[in-house]
Structures are given as C-alpha cells and as structure tokens.
Amino acid sequence: MQISISPTKLEVAQIFSEYLEEQIKSNKTTHIALSGGSTPKVVFDYMAEHYKDVDWSTVHLYWGDERCVPPADSESNYKMTVEHLLSKINIPKDNIHRVHGEDLPELEAERYGKVLEEELPIVNNIPQFDIVILGMGDDGHTASIFPHEIDLWDSKNNCEVAVHPDSGQRRITITGKLINNAKTVAFLVTGSSKAEKVRTIITKEEGHDSYPASLVVPSSGDLIWFLDEEAAAQIN
C-alpha cells in the first residue's frame, strides 16, 4: 500500500492525473473503472484541461458504480463524466462502456457483468481492470457497497444491485472480486469528513472491517491512497 498526501483537493487531482497519464503511456491498452463523486469531478476537469494530448484511443472507460437513473439525469455518474471529461477529449465512442442506469436494475447488473467479461482480459477467471478508481463515503462505503450491504462484496457475480441506506436509491456496482483482481486500485479521498474513516481503515483499528472500503486489498498488492491533508489529518 502506498499513500500520497497533497495539500489540497486540486493538488490531489494534479498528482493523480500525472500518475494516470504515466499508466496510459506505459500500456498498449488501459482499462479503467471510473468513480463518481466530488474528487473525481475535479480530476476530470484537470485532465480535460491539461491532458488533451493523451492518446485516449488506447483507453477504455467503465464505471465502478452507477445510479439507476437515465444517462441525462443530474444524478448520473456517466452524465457527470461526459460534462467534465468526455465532451472535452478525443476518445472513440466505442471505448466508453456505460452502465445503462435507465434499465431494469437486476437485468442491467447481469448485462454489465457480461460486458466486463467480453471487454476485459480474464485473469484468475475474473475480468481484470488495469486501474479501478474508488472514492470513499463518510460511512466507509466504496463503489456502491454500503456497510448495511457489506455481504455484496463477496458476491460471486461481477455486478450487483445495491440500495442506498438513506434514499433507497438503487445502484449498479461492481463487486469485491473485480476490485481486488485489478492491477491497481486507487482511492481518491479528500475532505475533513473522511479523516476518521481513513485513519480507522489504514491503521486497521478495531471494527475497521465493518466498512467496505477496508476490504479493498488487491491481490497485486498495488493499492494507492491519494489523499489531501484534511483527509489524512488523523494518520501519521
């Protein structure tokens, strides 16, 4: 596990963007699972402005989770990515593999799981992303696996339907076996509200394993936390 700490959210975006460009340049093809949330939004803005010259034709984009809403809905992770990145770079449409949030959730979870099997290399009998980008909620959730549904992590399926604990909103999420089979997993976590969970999970305090984010242990050993100083305030 590596930990990168930057003074601000913008500098987290800068450091991660530099890292991502290096990965894209070093691979013939790069399969990336994207995350929603405020920190990826800043990353997308930064990359759209500073990394237009990346050869995006070698990059295939997927989503680690998506809300069960149409693609034009303001809640859609896909819509956010289009507005902040995809509309501003030259990437082939065939390289964008969105979750169909408008479709029946159970059927879409099954369909998207098959898409991943068709598009990604199969390693250890599991589809393998080059990079999975994850956020972490104040409650310790990651992707769309929440503490009250932590058993979804161990699903035999590639994708599952999750339910937000407060709103009841349904979401499609990749499961633990895909996350931990990735070549690299990168957490993007910023803000003081995350500091307690960051400390609990990274230092493996008692009870840490009740948070889905603590279950991110890629078999490759390549796990990187990109934090700002606020999120890292409670770790040494």
What is each stretch, according to the model?
Residues 56-130:
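Ligand-binding beta-strand-loop-alpha-helix segment within the catalytic cores
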